[in-house]
């Protein structure tokens, strides 16, 4: 979650709205196949208070992906389950990497701001360095005698 309140009536791709018969029709599978996939943990829809299954648009897409991997690619259901687990893990890691990159960018910006403030604070206190030319001239100082004025 991003911390913002969401409209409870807003439909997203994760909103569970489809009953099993509609989900089966949308995915092109038999309802019994959906129940089997749920038992195997391939696609786990949300449940109502009465234990009825409710599928989201994301679940429908996953059902289509499972069917494609099984029928077109010839992957068994155990292999498909592992693929789904790995894809979920990759998605979580990518999200975490994005969070860490954003935190790193924020820390780098804060560091640059603090560094600029430090540089600005000591610029007021420092006197620019100027190299003094060395000379071989000799200045003789003679204290004035009392009562005599110097020209």
Swiss-Prot record:
The cross-references to Gene3D superfamilies, in alphabetical order and at most eight, read: 1.10.1660.10
For whether the record's keyword set contains DNA-binding, the answer is yes
**A Pfam family of this chain:** MerR_1
Record key words, sorted: DNA-binding, Stress response, Transcription, Transcription regulation
One molecular function GO term is: DNA binding
The protein's role, per its UniProt record: Binds to three inverted repeats (IR1-IR3) in the promoter region of the dnaK operon.
Name under which the protein is recorded? Putative heat shock protein HspR
User: Where does this protein come from, organism-wise?
Assistant: Streptomyces coelicolor (strain ATCC BAA-471 / A3(2) / M145)
Coding gene? hspR
């Amino acid at each position: 979650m991003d911390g913002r309140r969401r409209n409870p009536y807003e439909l997203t791709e994760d909103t569970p709205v489809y009953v099993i018969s509609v989900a089966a029709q949308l995915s092109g599978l038999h309802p019994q196949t959906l129940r089997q996939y749920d038992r195997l943990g391939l696609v786990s829809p949300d449940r109502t208070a009465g234990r009825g299954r409710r599928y989201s648009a994301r679940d429908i897409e996953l059902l289509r992906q499972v069917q494609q991997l099984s029928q077109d690619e010839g992957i068994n259901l155990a292999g498909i389950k592992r693929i789904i687990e790995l894809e979920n893990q990759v998605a979580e890691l990518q999200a975490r990497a994005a969070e860490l990159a954003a935190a790193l960018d924020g820390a780098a910006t804060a560091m640059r701001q603090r560094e600029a403030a430090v540089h600005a604070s000591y610029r007021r206190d420092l006197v620019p360095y100027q190299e003094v030319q060395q000379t071989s001239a000799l200045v003789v100082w003679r204290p004035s005698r009392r009562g005599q004025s110097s020209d």
